[in-house]
Amino acid sequence: MTKNNIILQHFDGELRELDKLSMANIQEYAQMVGAEYRLITGKPFSPVLTAPCQKLQMIQPEFDRYDDVLMLDIDMFAPKDMKINIFNEPGVGMYHTTQKMLHRKIVQQYPLLASNNYPYWGGAIYKMGKSLRVALRSADTMSKEWMNRFNKPYHFEDEGIFHVLAIRAGVNWRGTFLDPKWCQCSFLPNPQDAGFIHVRTKITPQGPKREKMENYQALVDAGIL
């Protein structure tokens, strides 16, 4: 039976050049894997939470008619030769070096809210089936005031909220981690072998930094995008 899937991206504000390029690239990928595509704009999940927190909209009832929902940052790109259907791949989100560090940090800072025993996913990519989305949504039964603890730029934000909801929903971390290739930073080796490339400002893991558009253009010039 053919699955009914959708790929989402989110942005709050006026789209920049790289955002538009990412949208076009991901729309092309969505067409290849037979998924719908939609850009979510503004602050539909909560008008008082930061822009990244709006990714929580992916678990709302408006998407219940879809089997899988994939949420991608708006600086993610599929390489030219990447033909793998992510909807056939196991996992929900990223849990690599950065996420492991942030997981430790959120548990240290919020020991009554966070836990080492439940999953923590990076915010650049989430892939959730309907049962998980409904479970997370159903766990959001209390006042949303606790979400304000993560309502600061670069302070857990959507990652922190999803982590707490995963705890309350009793989500087992086993099998929820995506292969790192599905969110490979642009400065890492062999970007042509990535599932999705996450365009960053760094040129190498150690730096220096430059505009993301320059790093995007370097990937285009190399024939990867």
Each model region followed by its residue ranges:
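N-terminal anchoring/stem segment of glycosyltransferases
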Residues: 1-57, 61-66, 197-225
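Residues that flank catalytic or metal-binding motifs in active/ligand-binding sites
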Residues: 3, 55, 72, 121-122, ...
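GT-A fold catalytic core of metal-dependent nucleotide-sugar glycosyltransferases
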Residues: 51-105
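Catalytic core and acceptor-binding pocket of nucleotide-sugar-dependent glycosyltransferases
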Residues: 123-210
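ER/Golgi luminal nucleotide-sugar-dependent glycosyltransferases, focusing on the catalytic module
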Residues: 48-50, 87, 93-121, 180-183, ...
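Short His-Asn-centered micro-motif
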Residues: 9-10, 41, 72-74, 80, ...
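Aromatic-acidic/polar surface patches that form glycan- and anion
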Residues: 15-22, 48-52, 115-121, 151-158
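A short secondary-structure junction signal
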Residues: 81-82, 104-108, 135-141
